[in-house]
Amino acid sequence: MSARATRPRSRRGRHPLPGELDPVAESSEEVDTTNGSFETKPELLQEHLGPSLQGPGNRIKEDCDVGSHGVLPLSPEERREPEVEAHQALQEAPLDTGPAEITAPNVYETLKCRLSSLEAVVAAWRRHSLSFSKPVEAEDRDPGAPGSFGNEEEASGPGQQEAAHFIERNAWLRLALGTREEELARTQASLQDAQAENETLQRQVQELEDSLMQLEASPPPSMLRAGRRNSNSSSSGAERRPWAPQDSPMAHPFLQRLRSDSSTQSFGCLSTQRPSPEMYLMEDQMGQLQGNIEKLKCFNRLLLAVLQGYKGRCESLSIKLGKREAEATALHLALQYSKDCEEVYEVLLALKTAGLGAGVGATNGDLQAAEKEASRLLVKKEVAMDVKTPQPSPEGSSVDKPTPEELAAQLHGYVQHLRERWALLKIPPVLDPATAPKPTMPHAEATVQTILEIQPGPTLPQLEKSQIQQDLAATRDGLADLVLRLQLAQREKRGLELREAALRAQGPALRLLLQQLRWEQAHLMGDGSSGGSSEDPSSEEEAGEDRQQHYQGPPALLGGQMGKVWDSETVSQELSASLTRAVDLRAQLQSLRRQLEQMAQKGRTRGAQSAELNRELCKAHSALALAFREAHRKQEEQCRKLEQQMARMQAQQAEELAVLTATARALGDPGAPQPVQTFL
């Protein structure tokens, strides 16, 4: 039986020999070494180096002769060489007792060093295993050698047993090497994944940098200061990448992962450490808050724009309001002028009616009342006409009382003055539906909400109290807008009412003017038809018929061409006569106007003279009053002086009398004067 048959083909299902290694335990040790927990202990190395370092009691007796197989036994020094080399190779391998702390940039170099150390160990074991595999192959090629079928214990010497152990260990090492190669492939795959993830993160960081630059360029600096206040303060002292933003709150979660994992990566765990859920939640909240800040800033800008629009709207409304007030003032003045014209026309009508009635033979009471009313009106409107109306002179004066024609002329002048004032006014036109006031702009809240719904981005935060306040402010703005519109409508209504009143006042005035013109025309036509013949008592009836013919037109005569020619000749004669009378009346009117102007000038001159005389009289009166007061004052002063002199003289006389009385008593003269007597 050969030595190959005596070697175990498999270690499954049996316990290993005392001097052998368990492949399952070795594979588990290799796995621990792969995960970074491999420890180079002297006991494991002693166990890996085989039974040559164990005691002699653990060795199996070998009965076969080594020299018959052509295999020389190895000396202990030769057997120890591969063990020492393997031990040196394992010591040269950078296996640490703890997890290797490597950074992300030198992962590939660390893996390369580990791989080179493993290759050195495998090469050392392979070199020594080849030296022991040659005697075994010679034994396999010579199965019929003497003593091959002898006793197994005698045929297997110590060298063959060592060779078998090393061959089996070589197989185990090859298995471990395959495992290490698979792990290396997985490590390379994970390294490639890490590199791909790094590239992805770099792209994301570049995109974040671009977006950050856009955000820094578009919003005001206050947003950046707010972002710095919201940024994570714990990472202020940490080392930052050159491409990472300094204080931006928009930092991507992958950046924090890279920062946190750059100093904690190890050989056994190459994937980056994921942040905690609290970090994710905080980052999401920061992103939401930043979006809300941006949306609120946009909302603020929109509100400012709407506020500017409303300011312009208010200014335009104030301008329109001033314009409406000016138009209302103009309408008030126009209404007042219309009322004055109506009053003047009523007085003129009363004068004309009274004059016509007086010509027919009526009483003069109506005429006097009309003249009195006209005088009162002229006195009342004297300031508006800028003309001083001559007042009726008292009895005994040389100024005559104004005639009805003069009063009518003055009233016509006042009407002309009112018309000139009317022409100076600027009456607003009637408002058409096209020029009606347009409704105000849409509310700011609806406008801003519409714009915000169109714009992309995070929605506004759900505000409760602030939203209610905004709604309240919007309601107040709407109420103020409605009140302003109501005021404008009321002013427009008042303007329309004033315009309607002015038109109503103009109607009767125009009717009165038309009646007056018709009356004048009828009067002129009546004077022309009468022809100055007053001896026929039926002249009044003929004048009435002429007036009726004037209103109704010339009668149509039946007949031929002669009737028509006679009618046309009659009408032409009447027209020429009426024109002549009109010219005469105009000349008379002009002469009357000139006389009126002369009388007015005389009246003004006399008024000026009387005013001058009054001023002179006042001056003389004041001078006389002053002289009287001065004389009275002087008289009083003289009286007071005389009274004082009399008092002094009485006192002096009393003193002299007392002295004389005393002297007389002292002398005892019987012929002394009496006390009532005085001596001068």
UniProtKB/Swiss-Prot annotation:
Extent of Basic residues compositional bias: 1-15
Coiled coil, from the record: 177-219, 362-386, 479-506, 573-661
The keyword Coiled coil is assigned to this record: yes
Origin: domain of life: Eukaryota
Self-association and partners: Interacts via its C-terminus with the first PDZ domain of USH1C.
Family: Belongs to the MCC family.
Name of the protein described by the UniProt record: Harmonin-binding protein USHBP1
Name of the gene this protein is made from: Ushbp1
